[in-house]
From Swiss-Prot:
Its main location: membrane. It is found in: Membrane; Plastid, Chloroplast envelope. This is Solute carrier family 40 member 2, chloroplastic. Belongs to the ferroportin (FP) (TC 2.A.100) family. SLC40A subfamily. May be involved in iron transport and iron homeostasis. Keywords: Chloroplast, Ion transport, Membrane, Plastid, Transit peptide, Transmembrane, Transmembrane helix, Transport. The lineage of its organism: Eukaryota, Viridiplantae, Streptophyta, Embryophyta, Tracheophyta. Residues 1-66 form a transit peptide. InterPro entries: Ferroportin-1, MFS_trans_sf. It holds the Pfam family FPN1. One of its GO terms (molecular function) is iron ion transmembrane transporter activity.
Length: 591
């Protein structure tokens, strides 16, 4: 194969084709190949080459011609005969006004037509990472989350308080709580699967309607009991039709509330903040956690204030009015979220997905669909890349002793601790949780989400270990050991809430959007199972003297979560590196 310049090519075209008649000439121009004349034509009278829709002039400067050896027949067979529509004029190089070559070596100065591609600076990249994809939609999400969560937290405080006023025994409250956890354990996977195959906005509206309806039914049952039920035994109360309806409505209400929480915290916030904007996503998660803590405090305070001034039935009627008013507001806010985010929440469904939805909603197959959803959810859950981070979250739910709650309150009251100290301890834990939401976003910005998660778990495990040592070595009835014990538990909430925020973001990053609700529902289901197990352990070890055993189990679960997460962080897989390629932990410093 020989390479000649365009000048030689012009000579070849002008000279008679004698010895090189069987050669084929390739010009480096797409779609243009010169054909030799037919064998029947005179050697010096080659017909002009014709091609339809070609430009009237063709200027070729310093173009190499690839002359390859081939047969004449192959050259003729490669292309069909050219159409006699447009002749291709052969222009000699001397006719071209400017035949200077275009310099391509590095030292040559290039034309301004070839501009350098813009490269973002580190500050600009940080600004993009901290800017949400849809800021207006995110603010609308905050408003919806605040309003809906406030009504939900108010009701979560109202129904146990009303049952406690109705009957002095704790058994009715315990039964409702048990079946609530059981419904979440069984129903969360199938609800999560249904949410993954159903449009977001209609599902959001439907879940809000179900939650408000079940809250109203529960309130109606309690009001009916307060007006009609007199002094009765515990067994007589739990077998009444109104109580059975209360249990069923409470279970459905909790399941709908958790489904809404999973949708907003695992799916919607990711779409609005942006999966590739880790700082903005961390800040959004922190805001949602702050709103949750504020709603939990304000909801309990508002209903407690109402109970101190009005009759319980009047307070429940006020709560019902808030529920009814909340529904249209939540529906409008859902539409605003979608509109402000340029309809990012719209999800078109294919016919196959619609058939899946119809199959899941078939009442005749409810048991089969439930078992299938649990099996499918478990298979998807254990195959996710960020499984250790999710399992660590489940392990943290085993800590029911060294955390603010009913067991800790019972322990302190049994030891004769002043109620004011108990109240101050609960308030301090809430403050630490609120502070942790600010710390977590700062940690993500400085060290990345993976190291921030490890730091939160290590801090919590270390401080709970200190509290356990203080409990076993000193009497918490004394002032100094008691203060150290309570301070260690309160400070451990910094690590707990930090990992709660960061762990949520890790799952948001690692779980695909098409499976976010299914895997999130499965995690909630397993967490409910963990709480049921620890509740059973607490029932078995119901004496306060066995608190040390429960404390050891709690510390062991938190330490196990920290060890598992650090092992996962220290031995990353290729898939994990690819998933968190922008995390500082996996970024290589430039040499």
């Amino acid at each position: 194969m020989g390479m000649v310049t365009a000048t030689a090519a012009a000579a070849l075209l002008a000279s008679p084709p004698q010895g090189h008649l069987g050669r084929r000439c390739h010009l480096v121009v797409p779609g243009l190949r010169l054909r030799p004349p037919a064998s029947s034509s005179p050697p010096h009278a080659a017909p002009p080459l014709r091609l339809s829709n070609f430009v009237p002039r063709c200027y070729i400067t310093n173009v190499e011609v690839d002359v390859s050896h081939t047969s004449e027949q192959e050259a003729l067979d490669d292309h069909p005969p050219l159409l006699p529509a447009c002749a291709i004029p052969v222009v000699h190089l001397r006719d071209v006004p400017d035949a200077s070559p275009f310099p391509l070596h590095e030292s040559a100065s290039h034309s301004t037509d070839f501009e350098e591609l813009p490269v973002l600076s580190e500050g600009e990249l940080h600004t993009i990472a901290a800017t949400p994809a849809h800021p207006a939609g995110l603010y609308a999400l905050y408003a919806s989350y605040l309003f809906g969560n406030l009504v939900e937290q108010l009701w979560n405080f109202a129904w146990p308080a009303a049952l406690a006023i109705l009957h002095p025994s704790l058994l009715p409250v315990a039964i409702v709580g048990f079946f609530t956890k059981l419904s979440v354990f069984i129903g969360a996977p199938i609800v999560g699967k249904l949410m993954d195959h159903f449009p977001r906005i209609p599902m959001y509206t439907g879940l809000n309607a179900v939650q408000v309806a079940t809250q109203l039914i529960s309130a109606a049952m309690v009001i009916y009991a307060m007006k009609n039920v007199t002094h009765a035994s515990t067994s007589a109360v739990v077998l009444k039709p109104w109580f059975i309806a209360l249990v069923a409505a409470g279970a459905i209400e909790r399941l709908a509330g958790l489904a809404l929480g999973v949708a907003m915290e695992r799916d919607w916030v990711v779409l609005l903040a942006g999966t590739n904007r880790p700082v903005a996503l961390a800040q959004a998660n922190a805001v949602l956690n702050r709103l949750d803590l504020v709603c939990e405090t304000v909801g309990a305070s508002v209903f407690g204030l109402l109970l101190s001034k009005y009759h319980p039935v009047t307070c429940l009627k006020i709560a019902c009015g808030l529920m009814i008013c909340s529904f249209p507001v939540l529906v409008v806010l859902g539409q605003l979220i979608n509109r402000f985010s340029c309809h990012a929440l719209d999800s078109s469904r294919t016919p196959s997905e619609e058939s899946i939805c119809a199959n899941l909603l078939d009442v005749r197959k409810i048991v089969q669909n439930g078992l299938s959803a649990i099996r499918n959810g478990w298979n998807e859950y254990k195959q996710q890349t960020v499984l250790p981070a999710s399992v660590a979250t489940v392990f943290l739910n085993f800590n029911v002793a060294l955390a603010p709650g009913a067991i800790m309150t019972a322990l302190l009251m049994h030891r004769g601790i002043s109620p004011s100290i108990v109240g101050a301890f609960s308030g301090l834990c809430s403050i630490m949780g609120l502070v942790a939401t600010f710390i977590s976003s700062s940690l993500v910005e400085r060290v990345g989400i993976l190291k921030a998660g490890a730091a939160g778990l290590i801090v919590q495990a270390s401080l709970l270990s200190v509290a356990l040592v203080v409990y076993w070595t000193g009497s918490i009835s004394q002032r100094t050991p008691l203060l150290i014990f309570l301070a260690a538990i309160a400070l451990s909430r910094l690590g707990h809430m930090s990992y709660d925020v960061v762990g949520t973001q890790i799952l948001q990053t690692g779980v695909p959007a098409s499976k976010a609700n299914l895997i999130g529902g499965m995690e909630v289901s397993i967490s409910s199972l963990a709480e049921l197990v620890m509740l059973g352990m607490a029932i078995i070890a119901n004496d306060v003297s066995h608190f040390g055993f429960l404390a050891i189990l709690s510390v062991s679960s938190v330490a196990g979560a920290a060890w598992m997460f650090c092992q996962w962080l220290g031995n990353p897989t290729d898939e994990q590196r690819e998933l968190f390629m922008f995390d500082p932990h996996f970024q290589v410093e430039p040499i």
